[in-house]
Amino acid sequence: MRDCKVGLDFGTTFSTVSTLVNNSMYVLRLGDSAYIPTCIAITPGGEAIIGGAAEVLSGDDTPHCFFYDLKRWVGVDDNTFKFAMNKIRPKYVAELVEGEVYLTGINKGFSIKLSVKQLIKAYIETIVRLLASSYSLRVIDLNQSVPADYKNAQRLAARSVLKALSFPCRRIINEPSAAAVYCVSRYPNYNYFLVYDFGGGTFDVSLIGKYKSYVTVIDTEGDSFLGGRDIDKSIEDYLVGKYNIKKVIPATYLALIKEECNNTNKSIFTILFDDGSVQVVEFSKSELEKCVRPFVERSIKLINDVVVRNKLTSGVIYMVGGSSLLQPVQDMVRSYASTKGLTLVADQDMRSAVSYGCSVLHKLEDNKEIVYIDCNSHPLSDISFNCDPEPIIRKPMSIPYTHTVKMRHDRPLKTIVNIYEGSNLFMPENDWLISSNINTTDFAKVGEEYSKVYEYDIDGIITLKIRNEVTGKMFTLPNSFTKSDNIKPITFKLTQLSNTDDLATLTSLLGYHDKNFERFYGLFNVPTILIKEIDKLGGFKTLYRRLKSMNANF
């Protein structure tokens, strides 16, 4: 069994997991797709089933509780819960329990309430274990992506989940930064990359610069509530108004209408509602463009902020994320690029680029092929004496970064250090990150010098410390807002099969009917070769149709 270091793009609607082993990229495929729906079904027996298999699972045959929207709840707390509820408008129960969001999923014969952290942990454990079992690998490290616009609370929540996994995590990487690592290796002739990451629920843009072996994130912008889900909702509202539909259009049909309208000339669609009723609708490419336009315009405004701020006149806009596949999105961004002297690249791997970048970064850093430097997403300010906000970490700033403020202990003082994250000029509208009580006599004698030390780590997490400049002793200040990062342990069973397991089962069944398939039995322990040999015969779907023709039970 070979060791592997994994790259995970944990997305709002779809996730992708990959690993680079001996310069070959291995990707988990479920249902013949590398884009695994970010949803999970939990059964009464404790089985966890993810992706498309969870979406189509019948409640009559297998009672379960169905969860989705996991990423949209990351880092939501008492201060942001109402805002998140208004944005997400969940069709399931979401509630705060001691400052943490718990979800009660869609009841399909079974109901259970779990924390968002428990659900995300179960999903990540399952998707990574399926990758490992597919290629007979042992996971020894993980890089996971997060939206560049994530604030400290969201990054802390993400890191607490990763710390609880059964395998180690190296780092959290901003999604556009991960994509940039991949595209820098694919397009070495460019020095500046604007990574346009339009996903299912979030939008990010990052400006990446390359100089020799240095790859640095220069600037970033984003919106944690702008993505494909907004386009789906716009399509739903449009169809409801056009046909006076009184029922909720299932999300799967909205996604299907959007995808087929974009990729084919089809304009007539049939919607099957949850109650079994049917509605035929007409939806054209021009109507798709009308629904998409407002959201792309919002994304272009964010791109332009980065372009203008950095006086960018050359480079490439590299499109990433599932929503970037939409033709109206590409057309509008291409039109914008032409006005700024930029080149648009819509790569065939745009949906996988973030995961691939996370995987590639392991190798590049291990071999010291590049020096990768990220930057912060939001400025930080300290509300000190007289309630005057003092910027301590501007945006953009290369991270990790340490800011030191030297002070002299002239007299004993009791005060509070308050740190806010955000760029709103009205400071209370920003995120209140840290509130620490300080008694200066705890850290220095009268007459001694001491320093406030603000540490911003590679994952975007801030820590406040006091250093006595005479003794050199460092004190980490407790944060009154700190929440426990412990996740209530709950163990789920992995009963789901990977594509490789499916192929082995299918080949065994075919071998019963046709002895020619017995030659594949010896390949069950070398899954990559098995997959290649089966692909030569037309792939899983072709062989499955062949089995159905041999046995009516299939």
From Swiss-Prot:
GO terms for cellular component: virion component. PROSITE patterns: HSP70_2. It is found in: Virion. Keywords: ATP-binding, Chaperone, Nucleotide-binding, Virion. It holds the Pfam family HSP70. The keyword Phosphoprotein does not apply. It comes from the Viruses. One of its GO terms (molecular function) is ATP binding. Belongs to the heat shock protein 70 family. Transports viral genome to neighboring plant cells directly through plasmosdesmata, without any budding. The movement protein allows efficient cell to cell propagation, by bypassing the host cell wall barrier. Two movement proteins, p6, Hsp70h and three structural proteins, CP, CPm, and P64 are essential for cell-cell movement. Also plays a role in virion formation. Together with CPm and p64, encapsidates the 5'-terminal portion of the viral genome. This is Movement protein Hsp70h. It comes from Lettuce infectious yellows virus (isolate United States/92) (LIYV).
